[in-house]
Amino acid sequence: MSSDLISQAESISNIEILRALFITDTHTTVGDVAVPSAEPGVEHDQISPGESDEEIEENISDQNNSSSQKRLQNAQFEALLTRRAEDTSNENIDRVPLNLSDNELSIAHLVAKQDVGGGLLDPREYQIELFERAKAQNTIAVLDTGSGKTLIAVLLLRHVLQNELNDRANGKPHRVSFFLVDSVTLAYQQAAVLRNNIDQNVAHFFGAMGTDLWDRQVWEEHLQQNMVIVCTAEILNQCLLNSHVRMNQINLLIFDEAHHTKKDHPYARIIRDSYFKASPPQRPRIFGMTASPIDTKGDIIAAATRLETLLDSRIATTSKITLLRQVVSRPIEKVWAYDRLESPFKTNLHKLMENRFGNVKALEGVFRFAWYASSELGRWCSDRAWLYALADDVLPKLEGHVNKLAESTAAATERDMAFKEITLIKEASNIVKAHTFNDPEFPGELSPKVRLLQTELSKHFSHAPETKCIIFTQKRYTAKTLHELFTILSIPHLRPGVLIGVRSGDIGGMNITFRQQFLALVKFRKGEINCLFATSVAEEGLDIPDCNLVVRFDLYHTLIQYVQSRGRARHYHSTYASMVEKDNSDHEARLREVREAEKTMQNFCETLPEDRILHGNDHDLDSLLQHEEGRRTFTVKSTGARLTYHSAIAILARYASSLQYEKETTPQATYVVQSVGNTYVCEVILPEKSPIRGLTGSPAIRKSIAKQSAAFDTCLLLRRHKLLDDFFKSIYHKRLPAMRNAKLAITSKKTNQYDMLLKPSIWRRHQGILPSKLYGTILSLLPSEPLSREHQPILVLTREKLPDFPAFPIYLDEDIETKVVPRSLDTGMELSAEELRALTTFTLRIFRDVFHKVYEQESEKLPYWLAPAEPLDANGREPGPRGIIDWKTVTFVQENDEIVFSRDLAPESLVNRFMFDKWDGRSRFFTIKVMEGLRAADPPPSSVPRRRHMDNIMSYCLSLSKNSRARFLAGCHWDQPVLQAELVRLRRNLLDKLTTEEKKIQTECFICAEPLKISAIPPSIASTCLAFPAIITRLDSYLISIEACDELDLVIRSDYALEAVTKDSDNTEEHRGQQIHFQRGMGKNYERLEFLGDCFLKMATSIALFTQNPDDDEFDYHVNRMCLICNKNLFNTAKKRQIYRYIRSRSFSRHVWYPDGLTLLQGKDHSKKMLSQAKHALGEKTIADVCEALIGACLLSGGPEHRFDMGVKAVSVFVDSPSHAVSRWKEYIGLYKPPNYQVRKAEGAETNLALQVEEKLGYHFRYPRLLCSAVTHPSTPSTWYFRVPCYQRLEFLGDSLLDMVCVEDLFHRFPDRDPQWLTEHKMAMVSNKFLGALAVKLGFHKHIKAFSNPLQAQITYYVEEIETAEAESEGAVDYWVVAKDPPKCLPDMVEAYLGAIFVDSDFSFEVIEAFFQAQIKPYFQDMSIYDTFANKHPTTFLHNRLANEFGCTNYCLKAGEMPAIDGMPAGVLAAVIVHNSVVSEATASSSRYAKIRASERALVVLDGLLPYEFRQRYNCNCQVVGNPASAPDIGTAI
């Protein structure tokens, strides 16, 4: 509806506007307003009062864009959640955990354990008689309590189900039987009876299971899976109205306690709104059961006839009364007459309480009962009521009740009164606790009525200790007080209990759950309780075991109460006692009336003609339905769903609930009814997040009709705007922000192959041209301990000057860490052609002698040259650029292809040489010494590595073929010395330590020189050159990462650049997880920088959004920020800039390090291997993570003016959005235009607030109104207090600033900690728990401006608790950990304060750091004390177990809300899913504790499993095939 239309039509009623909007004419005039129709040619909803109109709507399809694996696991969890919601109620009764105590069992198991209804099928003649009648026609069976009405229903059900199965076999549509009950406890009980006697699936549902949220599909599944459904009547009523279930899908409707069918009871609404709306052939059979067809005073015959008409049935009872009396014995009825009671009076305690607290509205009910009890029960009972009405567990409920009433009005006086009431209630509780109660046995303490009850019970239990007794009271307080009294009186053999009804939202100490109610019945059945004080809940339907004494402490008011309560006395020779006051004419009249009414009812039932039909009652039906006239209905033609006045209220409640956002309290629709003349008008106000805020309904003569009419019109308006679907379900599902899952909208699976740079472009530039000038980079090795051989520095000469590289480690000898120190020379050197040729020869000789590769001598094609470097002179100075090269060695190598062996060579000259086998690249040796005791003809010692020829040392060294070997051995010098030598391992990846297999290789050898080549290269140079493959691999990686930075126009230190693009396993992002396909020796990977960059990205975008969108609310900020920082956005930018080419996902390769472009003459060609390695598989999330890591690298690299400048620029590069188009930190200030509220002159109160805070925290506000905004709660009306926006915007900004300052501190303080550790410990620093305690420490709680009394009470309680915790902590800084969670406003205020000082200081991050150092860091100097805050969490353990020990990456931990069951609060189900298997599940009151329990149970299941057993059990192939799933959704430990 347009705003213009609304503004023009303010004076016109909403219903008229609605009619205008729904008419299909081109224009319809409403008053003076012309209302255009919607799209022409489209059929629209038609509304006319008093008629049922229909519509056709287009279906709205849902789009599901999640990945298949996530979708599968989500679907599995949703199915599990639905199943558990059912299972919690429809538990498998064949598997009752009998080893548990009753207190630990659910209601369903308690019912099963008691075997309710077991062995029931033994029908008597009168039951068969009524069964035959019920088969033939709709019937209301009227039989005494205990006479077996349920058995008749079972017989009828079996008959109907048999016919149904036959119909299904003949292809007819499936239909289901519904057994309707009036209470949750009866749903359990009757379902248990049916399951014991019917061999088909029986389900039972009730509202607390969340049935109102089930959609058509869920109901279709239940109808397919079950033949019988037991449920509370309102569930079926709503299903029929929403068209989830249609009347023609039901074959039998059974109404338990059918006398409730009257007025607006769900029984009556089912018949009126759905049953009679269906055509007669589509209506199901009806069977009603009751002990008396009426439960009101008045004309009994008329009431019975009205019941017959409304249920479209005939009342029937048995003609075999004698047989019935044999089965159901009537108790002996007695009257216990007590002396006349005193008039109500005020006890001393009552007077005291009235004088002090008589004006407290919340205690009015207690005052009333205490006044009543003084007469009915006596002085002691009157006073005792105060004790549990003001008990400690009741006080919070009373206070909440007071606050809720206060919040319903905007008057300040009401809120002040509420605060005073809470204080008075606490004071009243203290007075009652201090009061001394008399002994109830003292004279005058109990009323004559209670004294008589005491006397009679003592008599019965002393004469018959096995007595079982039920005492019926009218009031819940009476039952509870009497229970307490008789517990104290301790009558021998009497074991009292209490049974009162469940009443949601009850206060005053009367709360009870369905579970407690049922446990009381179980104990009564077992005899643990033998005297039950009960209200009317025990009268009706509940399967209470035989009693031999029933007492009406408070006399009945209706026939049905009399019949039902008397029916509890089922034991032979039982007594039914009515307590009446002597000389009380009213009591005597009631005794007389119920007996006469019962006789009249019996006569009516017994004299019903056999062939009486209902046709003559049509006029009665019309009269019963007449009051529905004028109440419009609306039907969706496509589905049949119907909207009525009654259903509209429930539909709006569900719609409002669907708007719940994250952890908000459940939103509600608000109804404001006002009188207008002689009529009432209701305004409906929907929650603030609803696109439609509500409307004002039409006038009505009654408040209830006005409310229903407005709700009805609001539903139509929601339909018009497509906010309710074809079943009147909300299109929202407890909606979270749009795109809230954007960060998860990509996959980390290896779904794509991307190009990967193998060599930096610098080697290709100018290749093919002979250089005249070269630039040198010295490679020096600094071992951490002495090496076995000398390693002389070498020089890498390049056409272009190489950048400066950081030092990095390699591992020489037996894993001695050795630092490679590259240093680029500042000036180049001019070289002659001859010098260049000599360097080329030296370089190619290294490749031949050391690496068994012979290249053609093509100087112009070499990408770089190697040369020996001169050592430092005596003064530690290097020679000049030309002098740095050891030309003497270069010349010697150029002039000597090898050192030729001859017999004239002195043996000592063969020591400390580098020798190699020309024909075998595996044989490279460093000679150590001459072995005097060995000859060439001797067999090699047994310790040497095994070779093919082991007959003698000469043959051992020879790798020639058979013929060549024979010729060589015939002509060689057998008298040459034997040398001890070290075999060079084939290992090339010196960037990593030795593997276990490499350590096993024996390197000591004994050789002769003649079969080998003696290299002209000095051993010290050869030793260094053996490390060159690892060194050049690392230098290549540095150069490629620097190219990436150049591509992005970012200046980043080379070590940070490489770290940011290094992915050393398939699942690097899964911190602490067992790394899949781990690449050894790659150095640091991107995970720490990604952690830092992610935090800076969040802060930078938060600042940008805050500065450019001053009118957005926190909700918009969050959503817009998520769109900027989501992985999908980062991935798209990275893909556009081809960042994937620069990512290093492979470690050292033996095939890739060789120079490109040379002609290979001898040796293995690796060009094909290089082509295959030019692609790598990357997940989209990896690429996005690298973007964040590059941001982190920029942050550490600093900037030209501000240390964050390069980080800011990187954020702009990667988010690629106009929302963040800044390249320097100071540009944020230019974007920010201070809003009017900030720059407006501060008033006295605002200045005073700023001064108070400045005294405590030291920061001086230039704009005090920013601070005022930081302490203004969202509940505060905009016209109150400082008239500034609430703190939410500043809190959004401050949250990101706090994250950043904490992350930076941890990052730099703990350089070796992984991101998971950093995250877990950051969680402690930014947790609401800590920030709440800090807010109290800093006194922020005193300054909050809020319009919420509950909030003030919560703050008061929290402050008391946290201050107590601090006082008792003996100086421990982690005292806050043990406290409960604070009200969220307190941590929000701390974050808002940070946002305020940041803005006030012109975006100075230094003020944030100063606050952190002064106020936060002192609590976190020793981070080890917070290890258990998250790291010891079961969820973290589970994550480590699955990822590290089992190598599984395809698992998740899901949590979802469960409906309230057994009268308990709504719970949360959590489940651990591994691949497609649910490993464990658990329920708890919150997601946090459900996840903890599920994780603990999963750890128990996994305990003792070996990895291969795990893989077999859960079909896990993560480790085997190396196909990592998306990042496990394991949840957070906090």
From Swiss-Prot:
Domain PAZ: 888-1016
Sequence ranges assigned to domain Dicer dsRNA-binding fold in this UniProt record: 648-738
Feature type site, description Important for activity: 1384
Binding site for ATP: 143-150
Domain DRBM intervals: 1436-1504
Recorded superkingdom: Eukaryota
Known EC number: 3.1.26.-, 3.6.4.-
Feature: compositional bias, Acidic residues: 51-60
GO cellular component: cytoplasm; nucleus
Binding site for Zn(2+): 1448, 1475, 1516, 1518
Stored PROSITE patterns: DICER_DSRBF, HELICASE_ATP_BIND_1, HELICASE_CTER, PAZ, RNASE_3_1, RNASE_3_2
Region (Disordered): 36-70
Ligand binding (Mg(2+)): 1291, 1388, 1391
Ranges for domain Helicase C-terminal: 456-613
Sequence motif DEAH box, location on chain: 256-259
Top EC group: hydrolase
Family the UniProt entry places it in: Belongs to the helicase family. Dicer subfamily.
PANTHER family, alphabetized: DICER-LIKE PROTEIN 1, DICER-RELATED
Protein's name according to its UniProt entry: Dicer-like protein 1
